[in-house]
């Protein structure tokens, strides 16, 4: 399965406590030989779209979703997600992280890839929300 990640980062390639859609750019990672490799850096051209009317607008959310889907992305990684999280998890696995350092997150994800692939293969939509805190990948377990 082809898995691509979009990391929401600032100009210094660090995660920030901003909503996913408010990030400056996305680092796009793919899996090669069992490791995450940086494929490209993409500016968030929808960053300031439609924000004069409503923060977290549906129009902006859909623009970002469509752009990332066109790139083949299926996992989003950020310190925060906004009100569009329900729309996001219909198309992507969202992962909330607590570290600003991309390398730390890359290392954790590399060791936990099987969980991400399993989620993508078992659910075609309405993915679970994952978190990475202190180097540990977690998800909510439904009873």
Please place each PLM-identified region on the residue numbering.
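Mid-chain, well-packed structural core segment of small domains
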Residues: 65-99
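Amphipathic coiled-coil/heptad-repeat helices and related helical stalk/stem segments
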Residues: 60-64
């Amino acid at each position: 399965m082809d898995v691509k990640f979009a990391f929401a980062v600032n100009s210094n390639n660090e995660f920030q406590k901003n909503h996913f859609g408010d990030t400056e750019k996305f680092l796009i990672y793919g899996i090669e030989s069992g490791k995450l490799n940086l494929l490209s850096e993409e500016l968030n051209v929808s960053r300031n779209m439609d924000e004069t009317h409503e923060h977290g607008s549906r129009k902006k959310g859909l623009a970002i979703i469509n752009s990332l889907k066109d790139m083949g992305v299926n996992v989003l990684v950020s310190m925060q997600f906004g009100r569009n999280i329900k729309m996001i998890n219909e198309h992507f696995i969202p992962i909330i992280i607590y570290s600003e350092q991309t390398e730390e997150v890359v290392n954790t994800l590399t060791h936990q890839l099987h969980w991400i692939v399993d989620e993508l293969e078992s659910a075609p939509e309405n993915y679970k929300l994952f978190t990475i805190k202190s180097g540990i990948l977690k998800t909510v377990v439904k009873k």
